[in-house]
Amino acid sequence: MPFDPRLQPLTAAEARVLGTLMEKARTVPDSYPLTLNAVVTGCNQKSSRDPVTTLSDAEVQEALDSLRRRAMVVEIGGQRATRWEHNFTRAAGVPDQSAALLGLLMLRGPQTAGELRINAERWHRFADISSVEAFLDELQSRSEEKGGPLVALLPRAPGARESRWTHLLCGPLSAADMAAQAAQAAAPTSSARAADPALAERVAALEAEVAALRGSLAALCGQLGVSLPGQP
């Protein structure tokens, strides 16, 4: 029977552990499957995580054991250490593309279709935003026989340009929960940027590029003897 989050929802720790295994399988295949220590490190890393967690070895082991009982992860014995790999695609009955989107939502929280396409670059290269939306729509319209929807489109928060998607692997959300998630996701903070060095680096690079373009435009306007746009 396909995974039904309404009957057996994941805990927050289980979602983080599962998402971490799914991520590392795609981004660092040479180090996969993962040892317990590697899973803990991946769960608690500060980049590409929202929220940032401080799960203990015991908490991660408990989550792994629970996921194993539901056939969502597999324990692999080894001479030096036990390793773990995910079995989510088969357990949930979803294609790799959908699994990639769900993994990103578990690790990074609610995101727009455009953000998911960018963040999925190392997981799966979607041709365009429309292809991302197509897989999200399939996950949202998942039939009752298959376990019901696995994602939901949050209401657009005030001031936000687009609505964000969230996963339902931890159980259904009430209207109040969805509104709260939408508001929180649409309000990035300086601490959130600091917790994600990769994001801060991208922002700094974009700011530098904009500054360089403005400088080039100012020089060109000077050569032509015209004012810089936006200036008298």
Curated annotation (Swiss-Prot):
Gene3D superfamilies per UniProt = Winged helix-like DNA-binding domain superfamily/Winged helix DNA-binding domain
Positions the record marks as coiled coil are: none
Q: Which domain of life is it from?
A: Bacteria
* InterPro entries registered for this protein in UniProt: DUF480 (IPR007432), WH-like_DNA-bd_sf (IPR036388), WH_DNA-bd_sf (IPR036390)
Which Pfam families is this protein grouped with? DUF480
Name the family the entry cites: Belongs to the UPF0502 family.
The name this protein goes by in its record: UPF0502 protein Aave_3438
Species of provenance: Paracidovorax citrulli (strain AAC00-1) (Acidovorax citrulli)
